[in-house]
Amino acid sequence: MLAPKKQKFRKAHKGRVMSKAKAGMTLAFGSFGLKSIDGWRVTARQIEAGRKAATRCMKRQGRLWIRIFPDVPVSKKPAEVRMGKGKGAPEFFAVRVSPGRIMFEIEGVEENIALRALELASAKLPVRTRIVRRYE
């Protein structure tokens, strides 16, 4: 799974995804891409599940780029623990995805296979998405 090698701080604020993406809104590598419509927090496990679903559909042909990286540590308190006594331990890593952000890109496969792979990857993510083409 994706995780940063080094961090400046162990824990982070919860934060919100409010505005549209300022960067990463256009296709940079592939011919087809998966673009977010909503702003939401996507975990490293969800990104990995989407990657596996897409590569399995592509039968390991072509190339898949992941344009997002989980760099925000999300902390969680254990079950049945009373309020207070500090913030919980870091549990997993996530990325805050803004609306309009390209998350996956595909190149080197036929159009119908690329569209199917991106649909399968989209089903694994908690964000509403749409598929974009380079020539649109």
UniProtKB/Swiss-Prot annotation:
The keyword RNA-binding applies. GO terms for cellular component: cytosolic large ribosomal subunit. Signal peptide: none annotated. Keywords: Ribonucleoprotein, Ribosomal protein, RNA-binding, rRNA-binding, tRNA-binding. One of its GO terms (molecular function) is tRNA binding. Gene3D superfamilies: Ribosomal protein L10e/L16 (3.90.1170.10). Belongs to the universal ribosomal protein uL16 family. Binds 23S rRNA and is also seen to make contacts with the A and possibly P site tRNAs. Part of the 50S ribosomal subunit. NCBIfam families: rplP_bact (TIGR01164). This is Large ribosomal subunit protein uL16.
